[in-house]
Swiss-Prot record:
The lineage of its organism: Bacteria, Bacillati, Bacillota, Bacilli, Bacillales. This is Coenzyme A disulfide reductase. Catalyzes specifically the NADPH-dependent reduction of coenzyme A disulfide. Is also active with other disulfide substrates containing at least one 4'-phosphopantethienyl moiety such as 4,4'-diphosphopantethine, but is not able to reduce oxidized glutathione, cystine, pantethine, or H(2)O(2). The gene is cdr. PANTHER family: NAD(P)H SULFUR OXIDOREDUCTASE (COA-DEPENDENT), PYRIDINE NUCLEOTIDE-DISULFIDE OXIDOREDUCTASE DOMAIN-CONTAINING. Belongs to the class-III pyridine nucleotide-disulfide oxidoreductase family. Changing residue 419 to F: Reduces activity by 80%. Loss of activity.
């Protein structure tokens, strides 16, 4: 009976194991997870902190016991894989509760260890990061136990923005600082202005080009010379791949510690796959490498690897489009395609439209800003971005499908919109992009 070992039990690992079991009722499947929880919704965590998700149990899909009862898959939490011997096909495992170590053999090994939150490195009792349900519980318990009011949020990526919004919704008083003036880097810089407008509108303090120099109790000294007091600090300063345990193996890592994979999510070592945040692949629509550490990619990779292991070696990954979205108070920011800083590798043109998300005479209308970049050599779409209070998700998802099928910007005129006054225009913003590009 083949033995399949999975490292990591969150989106990629648990999903892959589940999909393998759906296709293969016989193999012995075991998952090692170094932390407390398995199969939780990472994307729900800011909303648990904000009490928008009222019961944290909604963010937890399975316990190891429930997973075994449903799928006959063994999950061992607090078990950390600390080394791989790919020649003997074994992994070394540390039981973090007992400190005991043991070896486990495998026929197939699936690596989905995810990434860990970066830390600013200050020794402080009031600093927290947010990466898993344990972090969420620690933040929530600290807020309740210490009657927290003033919270400093460090960083301005999508997680920090979601955390800040949810702290505000909970009734706390957050302040945002960021070390540069470049916020929400997946979005075009000039399209991020509504973020600052929303902060101003709600009188939420923020400072760009600001950093922490020192923390002394609740007293924070900043690079600017300011000294302020906060009850709590939440750091959202990026992540790094959990690949340290891989370094002693023959598995190839790139300079940042990620694992390059082929279109079957195979590593350079036979019988070893990598999925989720740790894996790097390529874009679907252009010839560039891509790392997209978001939920869709982990789930798609999990399905492909499961099919491969079950014997369907014809299924392959066609690449990322990098579709992403974030809500910040009343606005939605969404984009798809290459990142803004990757556009310089192409000879491109940009076309944009700003108009109501639906018919102007229908109540509740608000402006939607839609922008498309296309390659001048073949007129295929490289990137699209949308910002507005309504309809950004719909337009970006439609453009994602267009890019998936390599449509040109001119063909957007042929997009047949589902039109009624509450939803769109007879000529949608997507159509107008096509007309303006001609």
């Amino acid at each position: 009976m083949p033995k399949i070992v999975v490292v990591g039990a969150v989106a990629g690992g648990a999903t892959c194991a589940s999909q393998i079991r759906r296709l293969d009722k016989e193999s012995d499947i075991i998952i090692f997870e170094k932390d407390r929880d398995m199969s939780f919704a990472n994307c729900a965590l800011p909303y648990v902190i904000g009490e928008v998700v009222e019961d944290r149990r909604y963010a937890l899909a399975y316990t190891p016991e429930k997973f075994y009862d449903r799928k006959q898959i063994t999950v061992k939490t607090y078990h950390e894989v600390i080394a791989i011997n790919d020649e003997r096909q074994t992994v070394s495992v540390l039981n973090r509760k007992t400190n005991e170590q043991f070896e486990e053999s495998y026929d197939k090994l699936i690596l989905s260890p995810g990434a860990s939150a970066n830390s600013l490195g200050f020794e402080s009792d009031i600093t927290f990061t947010l990466r898993n349900l344990e972090d969420t519980d620690a933040i929530d318990q600290f807020i309740k136990a210490n009657q927290v009011d003033k919270v400093l949020v460090v960083g301005a990526g999508y997680v920090s923005l979601e955390v800040l919004e949810n702290l505000n919704e909970r009734g706390l008083h957050p302040t945002l600082i960021h070390r540069s003036d470049k916020i929400n880097k997946l979005m075009d810089a000039d399209m991020n202005q509504p973020i600052l407008d929303e902060l101003d509108k709600r009188e939420i303090p923020y400072r760009l080009n600001e950093e922490i120099n020192a923390i002394n109790g609740n007293e924070i000294t900043f690079k600017s010379g300011k000294v302020e007091h906060y009850d709590m600090i939440i750091e959202g300063v990026g992540t790094h791949p959990n690949s340290k345990f891989i370094e002693s193996s023959n598995i190839k890592l790139d300079r940042k510690g990620f694992i390059p994979v082929n279109d079957k999510f195979e590593t350079n070592v036979p019988n070893i796959y990598a999925i989720g945040d740790i894996a790097t692949s390529h874009y679907r629509h252009v010839d560039l490498p891509a790392s997209v550490p978001l939920a869709w990619g982990a789930h798609r990779a999990a399905s492909i690897v499961a099919e491969q292991i079950a014997g369907n070696d014809t299924i392959e990954f066609k690449g990322f489009l990098g579709n992403n979205i974030v809500k910040f108070f009343d606005y939605t920011f969404a984009s798809v395609g290459v990142k803004p800083n990757e556009l310089k590798q192409f000879d491109y043109k940009m076309v944009e439209v700003t108009q109501g998300a639906h018919a102007n005479y229908y109540p509740g209308n608000s402006p939607l800003h839609l922008r498309v970049y296309y390659d001048t050599s073949n007129r295929q779409i490289l990137r699209a971005a949308a910002v507005g209070k309504e309809g950004a998700d719909k337009r970006i998802d439609v453009l994602s499908m267009a890019m998936m099928n390599q449509l040109t910007v001119d063909e957007l005129t042929e997009f047949e919109v589902a039109y009624a006054p509450p939803y769109s225009h007879p000529k949608d913003l997507i159509n107008m992009i096509g007309y303006k590009a001609k």
